[in-house]
């Protein structure tokens, strides 16, 4: 499957990206002082968390595990030298609900990390 994303310079350090589903996103550099526009690297971390989260929720639903809430934190170290990239990434998984089966939750997270999350696989090529 091929995805096409069209990205157009908007102004200053801002770009508009049209996703394959027609949704438009504004991305750029926070150096311009506009904190409401995400940077490409921060969006990568968000994509990593969402990719894994989708896997985990899907797996837990199949295991009949009911969550009341679930969040993932992504923390990454950016290198000092150019090209700056994330060389270390850690994810924290937080589950909330009654009578949660920790063994099944750990299995779901492990399956996402080792087998299903394609974004995780891409991150493996450049980060610990």
Where are each of the predicted segments found?
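Extended beta-strand/beta-hairpin segments
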Residues: 1-46, 57-128
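Alpha-helical metal-binding/catalytic segments enriched in His/Glu/Asp
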Residues: 51
